[in-house]
């Protein structure tokens, strides 16, 4: 019902691009709520084009739709959708340099989704880059620490799989320095001492 209403609204002459973009976004949101990802993506792309001056948050939302869609797919189609999400982040890196840390972090996540068993280490360079951005800060926010824990967890697991126990151990210990009660790090350390 809402989809028909918004489509009818789009047929009307809307003299303001911002208002038109708002209607298009509502239409995309309706399709997203119905899990009709193809149409949600199509209309969201139309929204970004109509808006013209999209923010980093607007662009990132498109990547999130691709990620949600990928979660409903399998095999090659799933990977292809994750690659589309990553391409949004690549484009954001150029267009929104102030969002570099966020974009790099999200590229790490998307690459970890494409390599869930960490066999290829696709996310490794991105997590390392995020680490390099955050670690030098004298004051770290809760968000900074959460990102570091995710980086360290990925890298700790990566090196555990590579049987580099010393490097793996160093990452698990870094997690415990931030979160002394972290159960995953505690359990992983028992594996690195065997």
Regions found by a protein language model. Name each.
Residues 19, 23, 57-58, 99-103, ...:
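TPR alpha-solenoid repeat register
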Residues 34, 69, 79, 114-117, ...:
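Structural motif corresponding to the intra-repeat A-B loop/turn of tetratricopeptide repeats
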Residues 10-20, 48-56, 89-98, 133-146:
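Flexible helix-coil transition and linker loops at the boundaries of alpha-helical arrays
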Residues 27, 47, 62-69, 107-110, ...:
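Structural register within alpha-helical repeat arrays
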